[in-house]
């Protein structure tokens, strides 16, 4: 998969728009647009960190829901 395809999957799973995705990570919207369009590539470590943050956020939300139920 290309970086832009991986980003699209991550964005879709997060339920965010491109603009929300950019704001969430504190990245200029135009840069994010270029990443999604494949006009610009980011360093691989940035992509890994973004995915890691999304995964951890999802886990934290899951734990919060569990705690609320108890």
Where are these regions (language model features)?
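A short, Lys/Arg-rich alpha-helix, primarily the initiator
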Residues: 1-13, 51-52
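Alpha-helical structural elements of signaling/regulatory helical domains
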Residues: 16, 41-42
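Short alpha-helical "recognition helix" segments of helix-turn-helix
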Residues: 20-22
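Recognition helix of helix-turn-helix/homeodomain-like DNA-binding domains
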Residues: 27-41
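DNA major-groove recognition helix of helix-turn-helix/homeodomain DNA-binding modules
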Residues: 44-63
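Short acidic DE-rich linear segments
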Residues: 62-70
